């Protein structure tokens, strides 16, 4: 796949602001931005961070071509000096981020940028694009996977995705979230995600008889024979013809691995009937795969109804996150450097949830030592260190009277260095390692946090030092207004 030049994939105001910083001699002022989100999609208890690998690729390749400069000259908005500066533009700052697959919560940084103002401002759009999209799909996929209760979930959404990147990177994110495979072939080629597939109704229709279609497919792919049985009549012909094809082709070869797929109708009822027919024919190991506009709600319902399903194929409602299709990540200035000192900045809003947490920060995840269970996340000023040998008092940053003292704990920093002085210092894990890490980290959360409806709120608290800084800034801004 040839690389695209994504340098100008930015909101236009990133360029006008960058030009403004440059012209006003603010371009080299060191600034700090946090990328975070405010609400978990679908009212869930946590989200899954994804998309960092694409951020890394973008930052590494970031440069303006001659064609880019000519386009910007044509706009007649930018100074000649600024355009000349862009000819040698490279990212020279620092980036910290949570590893992909990490469960994350509202209000905490998924990524922090420290860089000259021009650079930090310009990269905003693409960073949000990467993390918003893939975190959304990884989060949705994980909900679907957890609803399936251990049954494999295949990502089947390419044809309903919103564009090619939506399909390719959506499959990547879905795999991080726990899907077992994808129907998107290029995602296998690019990322090593297992590609899988059965057949379409058109295959069956191309033959004079349904049986001929099934027999031919079994002969061509005897070790991968999953037959689509709902083209005409599932119980009357589809399953009987599948059994006949298995008898005549697979059984003589000693192959027991086979499957059928249901793509329409009452899949709970049909799966029960199909299981009975297959078992009576001796195909107790035959897998029943179902698709047909599934999501976590439908999957939970049909499992409760006793559906006999082994594998779920989930398409449009996963790849588009149909029930809540926006992640809502934002990118906000939190500090600047003045004479080598970090000066915190705050954004104030009439909506309390939109007031930002200022300063260059660390994010600690606090775990119980005995169980390894995550208790809370703690935002601290960058120079704070948690002493694990002493009791730690946590308090709700809004309802400050709610306090908890934890002992016998350990703390883990979530933000890790990705770029230092413009150089990548982080080695991205392969996709299987990311998926494994995601599963392991979700296991550290309380079951109550993982509820689909009305989950227990996982606390993201502020250290005393950070809370006091935030409160002082609020008071000062309030007096100025």
For the regions a language model picked out, list residue spans one by one.
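Gly/Ser/Thr/Ala-enriched C-terminal appendages of enzymes
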Residues: 1-29, 33, 38, 43-44, ...
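Buried, small/hydrophobic-residue-enriched core segments of structured protein domains
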Residues: 1-31, 39-41, 77, 83-105, ...
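N-terminal, Lys/Arg-enriched amphipathic/low-complexity engagement segments
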Residues: 31-87
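Short coil/turn segments at secondary-structure boundaries
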Residues: 70-71, 139-143, 157, 450-457
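Short, positively charged
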Residues: 75-83, 163, 390-398
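Hydrophobic residues within beta-strands of alpha/beta enzymes
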Residues: 196, 260, 288, 310-312
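Residue-level "edge-of-site" marker
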Residues: 201, 291, 315
């Amino acid at each position: 796949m040839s690389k695209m030049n994504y340098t100008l994939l930015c909101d236009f105001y990133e360029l006008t602001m960058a030009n403004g910083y440059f012209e006003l001699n603010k371009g080299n002022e060191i600034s700090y931005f946090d990328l975070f989100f405010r609400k978990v999609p679908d009212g869930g208890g946590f989200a899954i961070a994804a998309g960092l690998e694409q951020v890394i690729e973008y930052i590494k390749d970031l440069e303006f071509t001659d064609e880019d400069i000519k386009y910007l000259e044509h706009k007649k908005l930018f100074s000649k000096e600024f355009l000349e500066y862009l000819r040698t533009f490279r990212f020279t700052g620092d980036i910290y981020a949570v590893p992909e697959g990490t469960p994350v919560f509202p209000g905490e940084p998924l990524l922090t940028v420290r860089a000259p103002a021009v650079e930090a401002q310009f990269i905003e759009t693409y960073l949000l694009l990467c993390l918003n999209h893939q975190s959304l799909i990884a989060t949705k996929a994980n909900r679907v996977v957890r609803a399936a209760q251990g049954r494999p979930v295949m990502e089947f959404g390419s044809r309903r995705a919103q564009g090619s990147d939506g399909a390719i990177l959506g499959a990547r994110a879905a795999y991080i979230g726990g899907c077992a495979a994808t129907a998107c072939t290029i995602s296998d080629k690019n990322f090593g995600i297992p590609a899988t597939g059965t057949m379409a109704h058109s295959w069956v229709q191309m033959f004079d008889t349904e049986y001929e279609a099934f027999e031919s497919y079994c002969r061509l792919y005897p070790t991968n024979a999953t037959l689509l049985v709902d083209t005409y009549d599932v119980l009357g012909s589809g399953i009987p013809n599948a059994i006949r094809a298995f008898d005549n082709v697979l059984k003589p070869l000693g192959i027991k691995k086979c499957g059928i797929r249901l793509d329409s109708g009452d899949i709970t009822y049909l799966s029960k009937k199909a299981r009975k027919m297959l078992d009576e024919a001796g195909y107790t190991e035959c897998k029943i795969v179902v698709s047909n506009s599934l999501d976590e709600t439908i999957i939970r319902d049909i499992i409760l109804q006793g559906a006999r399903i082994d594998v779920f194929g989930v398409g449009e409602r996963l790849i588009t996150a149909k029930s809540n299709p926006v992640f809502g990540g934002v990118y906000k200035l939190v500090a600047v450097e003045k004479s080598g000192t970090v000066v915190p900045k705050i954004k104030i809003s009439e909506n309390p949830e939109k007031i930002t947490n200022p300063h260059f920060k660390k994010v600690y995840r606090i775990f119980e030592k005995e169980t390894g269970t995550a208790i809370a996340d703690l935002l601290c000023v960058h120079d704070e260190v948690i002493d694990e040998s002493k009791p730690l008092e946590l308090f709700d940053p809004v309802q400050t009277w709610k306090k908890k003292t934890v002992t016998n704990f350990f703390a883990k920093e979530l933000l890790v260095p990705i770029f230092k002085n413009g150089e990548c210092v982080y080695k991205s894990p392969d996709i299987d390692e990311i998926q494994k890490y995601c599963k392991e980290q979700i296991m550290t959360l309380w079951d109550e946090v993982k509820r689909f409806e009305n989950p227990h709120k996982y606390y993201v608290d502020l250290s005393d030092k950070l809370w006091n800084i935030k409160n002082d800034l609020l008071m000062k801004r309030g007096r100025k207004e």
